[in-house]
Each structure stands twice: as structure tokens, then as C-alpha cells.
Amino acid sequence: MMNNTWKSVLCPIACGVGMLLSASPYSASGKDIEFNTDFLDVKNRDNVNIAQFSRKGFILPGVYLLQIKINGQTLPQEFPVNWVIPEHDPQGSEVCAEPELVTQLGIKPELAEKLVWITHGERQCLAPDSLKGMDFQADLGHSTLLVNLPQAYMEYSDVDWDPPARWDNGIPGIILDYNINNQLRHDQESGSEEQSISGNGTLGANLGAWRLRADWQASYDHRDDDENTSTLHDQSWSRYYAYRALPTLGAKLTLGESYLQSDVFDSFNYIGASVVSDDQMLPPKLRGYAPEIVGIARSNAKVKVSWQGRVLYETQVPAGPFRIQDLNQSVSGTLHVTVEEQNGQTQEFDVNTASVPFLTRPGMVRYKMALGRPQDWDHHPITGTFASAEASWGVTNGWSLYGGAIGESNYQAVALGSGKDLGVVGAVAVDITHSIAHMPQDDGFDGETLQGNSYRISYSRDFDEIDSRLTFAGYRFSEKNFMSMSDYLDAKTYHHLNAGHEKERYTVTYNQNFREQGMSAYFSYSRSTFWDSPDQSNYNLSLSWYFDLGSIKNLSASLNGYRSEYNGDKDDGVYISLSVPWGNDSISYNGTFNGSQHRNQLGYSGHSQNGDNWQLHVGQDEQGAQADGYYSHQGALTDIDLSADYEEGSYRSLGMSLRGGMTLTTQGGALHRGSLAGSTRLLVDTDGIADVPVSGSGSPTSTNVFGKAVIADVGSYSRSLARIDLNKLPEKAEATKSVVQITLTEGAIGYRHFDVVSGEKMMAVFRLADGDFPPFGAEVKNERQQQLGLVADDGNAWLAGVKAGETLKVFWDGAAQCEASLPPTFTPELLANALLLPCKMLEGQPPTAPQKSSPLPAQPLIQEHTQTDGQPVAPVATTTQTPPIPLADNHAVNRKDME
């Protein structure tokens, strides 16, 4: 027991001296420091040997829970760091960098394999001379371990991006994501009633690094009029698959049903396996491209994006221009867009996803490989086994070669191309694809063999001097006998050659900003021609202007025009708007002109502090009076969009969209609002405290009754932050840790814990049965093992988050030593005074506490408190940072502020 006594005495001494050293100019020198032990207010000071503390950089051996800062960059989590006694220096101490810590430093793999390890007891520690120039320094005042590591030893890192060693695969769990749209429409002329319900989403499970997924979609359509009633419904599982990250290869492995991912070949559905270089694993500056869809909705509308007949994306949009930018980049080829207006009209157009091929960095290779059987949407195979492979090689700086091959028994294609960065001229890529297709007689063909070529050129340039960008993405000319794999599979499925296969396809986009004038312009044009069917084209032009008019500030005006040509039908339209601020809201004029149809509207729009948005419009069109409204709410449980339309003498309609999900894990679960189906998310835990506001990069959400919340707006392979809004905490709740960070792999369910306590604040005095007190620095914890405070001198402790009737335990020497019970109820008088709490020694513990010690005078280890009329009052916080205290059994704890 006497040994423990001295440890309890030395802990505050060590920390106090350590802080003095860290603040002293002598700490950086090689000189020893002499101390006057008279300043120590502890018993038996003559028996305290502090000679070792006079040595430069000495830290009392033990385990400290510290933040790790590498070359100024802080790691997401705290780590237990052990200080050990070197064999060559019994009076010294040094950091034991264990393998778990070293793997987080981001050392290059070829260097990590050569590291030398030494043994300290049961611990493996990095030899101090393993890497020349590596240095560890402790900043106990800020609970931080500073690691200096030459940049040449480290993998590439970015401000918001971590190397693979720091990626987190998350925890096991089950997810269910959904996107449901419901529309009701009453036709006033015919009296018919229509209801349309559609939905899609993902069901999945996470096991280690594996993500198991099943995509679903369903629809229900009901029509009721005077003549008949019809109901159509459909439900299907469109895709079963599993995937995981391969960090060492910088790639993604996918098993099951998937879409061919390719930069040179068109996509199709198949079942099999693929290994693909994943751009998401690259730093943000080096990542790839995802398609963007722009258009104009003439009324509140539902926008569907489909590929080869399957819905990939579905959402509700208000009347006016819309832009969809959160599509998955895994699908290549042509996307079909359907805009279903609430007035019953429909727009349709195609969007090509072509982009300028990625210019690979010098000496690097990016690749994509797949093996499997093509199949239809009913999961039936179409042909035999196929294989595909493609790669891009960075030959020199700014010049890349790329190509690939794909084939099965009756179809083969090969592609070869080159990309070149031309400096101020821009970037260009050119490639050619040759195909051979054998059409066997038993499939209804005459046994002919079709051969042809397809040529493609892509160009992109940033005009920095005029703040603009031009992209000529994918002019492609295909000979009549050229067949893509997708064309070949269609021929096999429908037993005839598609007479309308593609001849030309190109997409042009241009962005221009006029920052001084507050103006911007956007233009996109895509066109497809076919050998034996009508051409298709689509263009969008958008002009925006932000300006002031006299004393009226922040006005905005926009002009949007579009034209689409699809299956021989043309659709043209113009949308103009003017918006004027009105307090925190705005009033507006909107005009929509489409052929013989026109609509003029006055509108009022606004938003609330919780992120809700609404729009109200009244106006006139060729039918008569018209009104519509739109409301969007980002709730903690789901995203909700509501819309309503009315047109005099024509129709009235209602629309609703719900997007959200459910996540269940071994650490708990929650309902939550939506993101990309099946994607990455973060489960946060606030120790059972409900209604705690937490947020990621988007709108805040709140924890449920179990103290859990899921943040859905979390990226993959990039550092994500989650934080508690301390200004909106529930009454009597306090957060001692309000910010966490994590870097998750794709599809992971991350988990982070916030230190939150809820309850009363009070001053207490802990007294043992023999009249003594728990030692200085002892921890007070509740039944959930949450730290509520620290014991100061004479058993005094300022506690936060206590609840009536609970049992508190006091810890020292690394274990719970005694416990005290709180009264069943708290009265104002009781909370206003110091409460004496008898602390009963736990079974197996000695009947008496270690000899008490007094704190260091004027030391910063604990917040000061004052007394009035002999009664303690709430402590007054000092501004000095508190270092962690090593415990005797090599467990560490951070000293928390007492209020």
C-alpha cells in the first residue's frame, strides 16, 4: 500500500514538473535543471526523489492518452502512448512507438518493411534509430504527441485526405435506404383520378471490409375514371452484389451483378467479378468525373434518370431550372432523363456521360478488369463468358497511353488511344476502337460477320485568364458495321440487328464567370445521330446575374433556355426570373414560355434556420389562373419534399417525396435522412443522451432516445468531421468532447463516441471510513463509466452530470477503490452546498486509503475553487491546459476540467 501511496504522490508531481519543463526555455537545451523541493506541499517530501525530473525531456513512465500530430497534422483519434525506461538509461524515459501507432504515421510501405523493432517487456517498440530524422516530442500541456517525420518517408497526403493506413472499415451492421415518390392528380375535364407511387433503394450488410448489397425498385400506378379502373404494379430486385476496397492496389473488388465500368467501352449489365482502380482513393485534386444533368421543369415535377431501362436516380424538383450533380460515376454510356410534370406533360432527353480520359501521372498505371456473363434485367444470361481489361499508363509528364480489349466467343473489340496535356492549349485525347461481331445463324441471323471502327476525340481547356472552361467531351464517329458490346447484346436479346445504332455522338460544355460583373454563363450541347433513325439532341443555356439596384442589394436575374429533340419530337422552352430580397426571404417573378404555352408567376420563397425551404407562386397561363407550392424539409429521420399544383379548369395535383434510411449496428442504430443509397455513413453515440444536435458537412440532426444518430452526408476516403452544437445542447447536458473525425472506406458504417453527460452540477466531499480522503487526482465516475470530476485536496470534487439515486465510484491506482451513493432526490438547498459523501471501500480493496497528499500550490492541474462563509461554491476555471496523468497499472486518463 505504501508503494501505491508514493505513486499517487508522484503523479501530480510528475505532471506539474512536466508542465514546468515544457514551458521552460531550458527544456530545449541539454542542461539539467535543479529544483527546490520546498515548493512541494506534500508529506514526506524528503522521501520524494525528483532528480529524474531535472533531465531534459523526462516523462514519468506509463501510458498517456494523447492526440497525435504528425508534421502539424492531427490524426482523427487519440492513442494510448507508452513511455518506457530504456535499458541503457535506468533514470531516463522514451516513447515506445508500438505497431498500432506506427501504422498510422503513413510511412511508405517499402520503408515500413525495413523498420527495426525492440522489445520492452511485452511491448514491441520502434527502435529510435529506425528512421533517421524521426523525432517524438511530448506536449503534455495540450495532451499531444508531436511527431516529426521527413516528408520523403511519408505517403502522399492532403489537407482533407489520409493515406490508406488511416482508413477505417467501420463496424458491422445492416442498412436499408429508400427513396419513395407519391403523386396524386385529379383531371377536372375528365374527372379521372390518378395515383403513382414509385420507389427504389438498397438493402445491405457490412462485415469487416465487405459490403453486401441488394438494390430494389418498385412502382404502383392506379387510374380511376368513368369508363374503367386500371392498376399496374411491379417490384423487383435489380442487383445483388458485394464489394470491398483493396487499399494496397488502390482498387475496388466487386462480386455479383454489376455494370461494366470503362473509359473506352460502353457499359452493360453482367454477373461476375471486377477489379477497378478507384479514383475515390486518390486525393481530391486527382479524382475523376461524374455526369451532370441540367434541365427546366415547367411545373413541380418528378425527374427520373434511367440507364438501359432501369431507374438510377429519382427526385422531386420545384418549377424552374434544376441541376443534378450527385449521380454515381460508375455508369458510362447514355443516360435517359424523364421529367414528369404535375400538369401531366412529360419531357424526355438523353445525356451522354463521356468525359476527357484521365491523364495518368508519370510512371503510374490505372486499370479496370472484369470477368463474367452478360445478363438481362431478369437475371437471365444473354451470352457466354466475357472478359475485359483496360489500362492507362503515364508515359511521361502530361502524356498517357491507354487502351483495352473486350470479348466473348462471338464478339471481340480492341481500343487504343493517347492523351496529351498540351499546356496552355488544353488537354486532348484520341482513340480508335475496332470490333468484330459474328452473328450465328441459330439466333435468326444469316451467319454474317460485321467489322467496323469507331473513332473518338476529346478536348478540354481551362481559360484561367477569363475564368472559364471548355470541354468537348467525346466526339465519336462509328462506321455502320461497328458494334459495341451493348449493341451486340441487344441483337442477341431481340434476335435482330438494331437498324438505328449510333453513328455520331458528341457533347460540348462551356462555363464562363464574370466575377467583377457578378455574372456567370453555362452552356451544354449534346447530339447523337443514327444510321437509320432520327437524330437526337439537347442543349441548355443558362445566364445568371447578381447585382444591386440603388439601395436594394443582392438582386438576382436569370435566363434559361433549352431545346430537346427526341424520337422526332422537338421541345423548346425559355425560363426567366427576377428575385428581390425581402428580409431573409425573397419575392420573385418567373416566366415560362414553351411553344404556344406560357406562364407568368409572382412568387414568395424563404427558408428557416433549421434548413427548411418553401416556395409559393400564383400566376396566369393560357388555361387561366394557376398556383403552386413547394416545401422541402431535412428532418432527423427523413428528407421530405411536398408539392401542390392547381390550374383553373384543368387539374389539381399533390406530390410527396421521402428519402431516408435505417442503420442498425452492434453499437446501436437509428433512422436517418437519406443520401446516396448504400453509401458511407457515420453512427455517433452520445452515451444515451437524447436530442443532442450533431452535424457533419450538411444540416444538423439530433440523437434519438437511445443517444444515437446517423450522419449520412459523409464522404469516402476523405476526412470527415462530426461535431456537437454546444449552443443547442439539452438542458443540464455537457459535452467534454464535441468534435470527432474519421476517414471511412466506401460504404462503411463508421462509429464515433462523444463524451456527453447529463445531470446536475454540485460540489461534493468524499470521505473514507477512517476519516481520510481519496488521493488527489482520483477520478469520479458514474455507472456508465463516464468521468464526472476529479478529487482535489481534502476530498473536494466539483461534479457535473450527476443524477439523484445513482452510485458513484472513485478510481485511483487504475481501479475502482470506493463507492458512494447519491440521495434519491436533489433539493435546491442540497445542490447549493457541498455534499458530504461517505465512500465505502470496495470488496478486495484495503480498508484504508493511501496517505493523502496535498496539491502543488499554484499548480495548473485542477480548477480553483473558492469558499464563502465556510461553504464551497462553484469552481472558477483556470486557463491553463491540464496534462494527462499516468496511472500505476499503465492505464492513462486525461484530467478533465472540473466545470
Predicted feature descriptions by range:
Residues I68, I293-G295, L682-T686, E760-D770:
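A short, amphipathic beta-strand motif
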Residues S699-K708, Q785-N796:
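Short, acidic Ser/Thr/Gly-rich low-complexity loop/linker segments typical of extracellular
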